[in-house]
């Protein structure tokens, strides 16, 4: 029970730090947590927590790259479907454009990149809430669009 309470305190402190302060590296987050009394924290633990809570690196108003939690979503978890993060998918002759909730584009783009060329994805470019995806050789933009639509429908 004691360790789960320490874990809850760590999670609470971690989320509060990401909301209140700007961190440009995982090392800075480690130091801030250590200053709050979490001696056993290290970079790999912080990296896992960033992934678990859907934190992304994005540019703030001063154009600095900082870690943040997706603001409007609360925190996506492994039980929340990624489909909820995708707001719209459309295409033209060159690219498929995916609009996401703020802060979620990099998470979705990483998923798409992991599928790779065999699934028709040559690559992605992600901003804060928009992703451009281009098809690999042998795939049309429409094929890629339909594959992405099916992928997010299956996430229900």
From Swiss-Prot:
Chief place of localization: cytoplasm
GO CC terms in record: cytoplasm
Protein purpose: Regulates arginine biosynthesis genes.
Name of the molecule in the record: Arginine repressor
GO molecular function terms attached to this record: arginine binding; DNA binding; DNA-binding transcription factor activity
Keywords: Amino-acid biosynthesis, Arginine biosynthesis, Cytoplasm, DNA-binding, Repressor, Transcription, Transcription regulation
Keyword rRNA-binding: no
Pfam families named among the record's database cross-references: Arg_repressor (PF01316), Arg_repressor_C (PF02863)
Protein family (similarity comment): Belongs to the ArgR family.
Gene from which the chain derives: argR
InterPro entries from the UniProt entry: Arg_repress, Arg_repress_C, Arg_repress_C_sf, Arg_repress_DNA-bd, WH-like_DNA-bd_sf, WH_DNA-bd_sf
Keyword check for Transcription: yes
GO terms for biological process, alphabetical: L-arginine biosynthetic process; protein complex oligomerization; regulation of arginine biosynthetic process
Pathway field: Amino-acid biosynthesis; L-arginine biosynthesis [regulation]
Subcellular location: Cytoplasm
Domain of life: Bacteria
